[in-house]
Amino acid sequence: MTTSGCNPMKSSSTSNPTIGFVSLGCPKNLVDSERILTQLRMEGYNIVPSYNDADMVIVNTCGFIDSAVQESLGAIGEALNENGKVLVTGCLGAKKDEIIQVHPNVLGITGAHAYEEVLAQVHEHLPPSQTHNPFTDLVPPQGIKLTPRHYAYLKISEGCNHSCSFCIIPDMRGKLVSRPIGQVMGEAERLVKAGVKELLVISQDTSAYGVDIKHRTDFWDGRPLKTDMYQLAAALGELGVWVRLHYVYPYPHVDNVIPLMAQGKVLPYLDIPFQHASPTLLRKMRRPGQVEKTLERIKNWREQVPNLTLRSTFIVGFPGETEADFEELLGFLEEAQLDRVGCFQYSPVEGAKANELPDPVLDEIKQARYDRFMQLQQRISTERLKQKVGQTLPVLIDEVDDEGAIGRSYADAPEIDGCVYLNGDIQVKPGDIVNVQIEHSDEYDLWGTRV
């Protein structure tokens, strides 16, 4: 059984009903899973790691791209075969007919972040125990977490107001709905008190935080705070832990958080999905297209924060992409010198506006462009990591085994970026932040010795 947390908190009571849980997709989906699991535990349900031990299985699905849809349908099928009683939630739940066509025997289907609906369906098909004792089935103040104890994802909003032509997230998760900043800060405080050393701020669009509620003023720690990205980042920076900003849309006001990085309040790291560098393609994608201004801003950011790490994602082979468009993208990579980059070959997503665009790119051309893109970016990433050799960096330890420790520097987000290897060092533990002198690098990772 594939889960993102096999046994978060199993109750000592053997009479409580049991739930198996499969969590697929992005960190935002993981946070949804944590919230559902927390509420289930508070109601006395046991969370178990195997199909055989579960009275029912919940599958939290992803439906962003076709491969994710197939993975989700496969996970639902596996749960049905192994257990038989399955509830489906998550992004793919927006395509209810598609699920029922393949798996007509599921007990129920809900969409993304439909917490109350999920719980209502659980209650209908598997009522909670009448003997549940909340004093023995305790849940920690920070709730159930599926990440290691020392880092946590902090979701600040749901949905998205953009209409990128290749994306169906607004159809699945709805328009932007920002959480009150006081509520977000309260959760962040609870996580830090529970031992979290790194907060990863996530949403569909972190830089749009508060737009939907006109940046309403809320209160935290007895003082007023506007619901916007800058004030949130500044307040999080007061908690004394690493703060990492993900999924930032390149709005002009992103410039305002750069001084917080220069002051050490927020990690010098920005995750900004540029998607392409050809103005023609960006218009077709319905993305910001002022590439020269973007390059100028990157230059200004690095003047203020020389050690800034920039992560981005790009799409090659988008409908209508010419060789000239692709060359513009390669030129952008050379000039921008981004640190961490992901690249995807365009594939149609059911329901996306881009499906209606003419001039699809042949698969062999997509593959060739992807290979050229990755070859160039690997060279850039290798050169940028080589500049860290000889430096001493703070490293957050993630794992320790007989061969040594593995951690991450400020430049590395979990799961998607590189690692720092401390070969032979077993005198540290996960969650420690130690200083490491960097001795070696490759295109993705660093090696060093604790000092």
Curated annotation (Swiss-Prot):
- List GO terms (cellular component aspect): cytosol
Task: Kindly list the positions annotated as binding [4Fe-4S] cluster 2.
Answer: C160, C164, C167
> Record-annotated residues binding [4Fe-4S] cluster 1?
C26, C62, C91
Per the record, the GO terms for biological process are:
tRNA modification
| PROSITE patterns per UniProt | MTTASE_N (PS51449), MTTASE_RADICAL (PS01278), RADICAL_SAM (PS51918), TRAM (PS50926)
Q: Name one GO molecular function term.
A: protein methylthiotransferase activity
Q: Which transformation does this protein catalyse, written as a reaction?
A: L-aspartate(89)-[ribosomal protein uS12]-hydrogen + (sulfur carrier)-SH + AH2 + 2 S-adenosyl-L-methionine = 3-methylsulfanyl-L-aspartate(89)-[ribosomal protein uS12]-hydrogen + (sulfur carrier)-H + 5'-deoxyadenosine + L-methionine + A + S-adenosyl-L-homocysteine + 2 H(+)
Family, according to the entry, reads as follows:
Belongs to the methylthiotransferase family. RimO subfamily.
According to its UniProt entry, what is the function of this protein?
Answer: Catalyzes the methylthiolation of an aspartic acid residue of ribosomal protein uS12.
**What is the protein name given in its UniProt record?**
Ribosomal protein uS12 methylthiotransferase RimO
Q: Which organism is it from?
A: Cellvibrio japonicus (strain Ueda107) (Pseudomonas fluorescens subsp. cellulosa)
* Gene name of the encoded protein: rimO
